[in-house]
Amino acid sequence: MIYAMSDIHGCLRELKDKMTQVDLQGDNRLIFLGDYMDYGINSFKVLQYIWELQKNYGDEKVIVLKGNHEQMFLDWINDFRNPYADGSAESILFYEWLETDFEHGANTLRTFISEEQINFLKQIARTCSWESISREAVQMILSDHDEMIWWMQHLPLYYETDAQIFVHAGVDEAAGEYWSFGTSENTLLGKFPAAKGKFYKTVIAGHVGTGTWGLANDRHFHDIFYDGESHYYIDGSVYKHGKLLLLGYDEKNNRYYQIENSRQIPVKKFERFR
C-alpha cells in the first residue's frame, strides 16, 4: 500500500489521528505532499513529527515532499540569515511572510521561538523595519533549529513511481513524458488551476482544496477528488474544516481508496449530482 497525505497546515491532532490508520509494515510507503506549516497552531510540531517519522523509518519508506508554504518560509529564512546583509529586492518581497504571520498573531513563528522572543519582536516592531525584525527572527530560529531548516531545504519536489507522480501542486503536462525537464519549480509548488483530464501517468497532488473552484466547486465537499481520468487531489482544507484526507493506493489491485476510520472507501469519479 502507498499512503499519501497533503496540506496538514499545522494541524497536529488531525495528523496524529490519521497516522493511527497508516500501516508502515512490509513494503508499505507513506508520501507527504507538502504544506505542513501555516494557518494551524502547531506548525513546528507538525514538521518535527514528520521529520522524526522519516528518521525512524527511513526516507525510502517515508517520503517527504516540499510545498509552497515551506518554500516561502525558506525564502524568507535565506534572505535574512546573514544579519549584516542589506535588504535585496528579493528580501523586500519575502519579509512579507513575517508581516503576514504577524497579522495572524504570529501563529507560525511562535511555534519556532519562545513567547519571550515573540514579545521582543513585537516591541521592536514599533520602531524597526520589517527587514530588521526579519533578521532578528531568522537568527532566533537558526540558533535552535538549524538542522530542521537544513532538512526542509533539501526536501524533494516530487516522487515518481512507474505509474504515478506525487507532487504538491502539479506538473507541466504539455511536456508529456518530458515533464520532469519541462516543469518549473513554480509549477511543481504552485500550479493553478488544478489540471484535469488524461495524462500518461496518474498525478496525485494537494495544494488546491478539493471543494474549491475548478474541482468540486462545492464548499461542503472535503473528500478526495478524482477526475475520472488521471488526477487525484487530496487537500481537504483541514485547517478550515478539521478533515485531513488519507489516500491509499493498493499496488496489487491498482485501486485507490479514501481511508476513514480504518475503512478503505473506493475513490470514484466526482459527479456533481450523485
Model feature map: region roles:
Residues 1-274:
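Feature recognizes metal-dependent phosphohydrolase scaffolds
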